[in-house]
Design a protein with these regions (language model features):
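Conserved N-terminal segment of class I S-adenosyl-L-methionine
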Residues: 1-91, 253-260, 268-270
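A conserved beta-strand element that flanks and buttresses the S-adenosyl-L-methionine
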Residues: 103
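Short catalytic micro-motifs in class I SAM-dependent methyltransferases
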Residues: 106-110
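A short glycine-rich, Lys/Arg-flanked "PGG" loop and its adjoining helix->strand segment in the class I
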Residues: 115-130
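Conserved class I S-adenosyl-L-methionine
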Residues: 132-159
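A C-terminal cap/extension of S-adenosyl-L-methionine-dependent methyltransferases
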Residues: 149-150, 183, 194-271
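Acceptor-substrate binding/catalytic loop of class I
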Residues: 164-180
Length: 271
């Protein structure tokens, strides 16, 4: 499949079922994580309703883990995972070295005690295994809005308050640099092979604005149980054309979020 065809497949998969802010963010993440080779068995931590997993694992994954029982019901209906478990990622019910690959997309920033989860990933991942994750980074709040415009209007105080509200509403606990995240991984034996920023300032602004464009999606979810009750209105060439540039944009020098690809060291981590 060509890169252009891959982008269209990913965008359409999200446009059929997700509000616009998730379409932008998740499509970029799906493109990045789809480029990784995952030996089996695969564990997806924070699998949620299974939609993202169905996009990056078109042939299915082995195990999905999430504490949200309602989300797991949706994931079960999709049939992406051979096994689903509602468990705490900081105390996973799996034997050591059970998996050859672990994936966790846009989950870590929502977990207060993230060190416990990272240690558990190192435990259940076999030596040489692949670990791939995406997180929000140190530039997330900075790039989310046009800070200069707020400052010109004399609204620096309200702007700070708005960002605090937005991150509280989004349940964000961690806004760390690549070095801080890398140190966390390396301490438990997850060796960082490469990392990259994504979601440039321009894409971050579009992601932010689309939260408010997506308010009708929220109403639809509450009324019908679906974010997109009429997929033909969004899953079409017009919206693919409008959003493709965010998914295909080159790696930015600095971005709102960070993707990491790691491998599990065979030797014990240095204490």
């Amino acid at each position: 499949m060509s890169p252009a065809d891959s982008t269209e497949r990913i965008l359409r998969a999200h446009l059929r079922e997700m509000p616009f802010h998730r379409v932008i963010m998740r499509s970029i993440e799906a493109r990045i994580l789809s480029e990784v080779s995952y030996p089996r068995p695969i564990l997806d931590i924070g699998c949620g309703d299974g939609h993202f997993g169905s996009v990056i694992f078109p042939e299915g994954a082995d195990v999905g883990l999430d504490p949200g029982i309602a989300d797991l019901s949706e994931a079960r209906a999709r049939g992406t995972y051979r096994l689903l478990t509602g468990a705490d990622s900081g105390a996973m019910p799996f034997r050591s070295a059970a998996f050859a690959s672990v994936v966790s997309n846009c989950v870590f920033e929502h977990i207060p005690n993230i060190d416990a989860t990272i240690a558990e990933i190192a435990r259940v991942l076999r030596p040489g295994g692949v670990f791939a994750t995406t997180v929000i980074g140190e530039h997330f709040s900075e790039f989310l809005t046009d800070e200069k415009a707020w400052r010109r209007l004399g609204l620096s105080g309200p702007h700070r308050a708005y960002l605090e509200w937005f991150n509280h509403k989004s349940v964000h606990f961690h806004f760390d640099s690549p070095q801080v995240w890398s140190d966390r991984f390396e301490r438990v034996g997850l060796q960082v092979q490469r990392w990259r920023y994504y979601l440039s300032p321009g894409a971050a602004h579009a992601f932010h604005r689309s939260h408010y464009v997506s308010l009708p999606h929220l109403a639809a979810k509450r009324l019908t149980g679906r974010w997109v009750p009429f997929p033909a209105l969004t899953d079409n060439a017009f919206w693919v054309g409008r959003l493709r540039r965010f998914v295909d944009e080159p790696e930015p020098e600095a971005g709102s979020c960070i993707a990491f690809i790691c491998t599990r060291r065979a030797d014990p981590p240095v204490k």
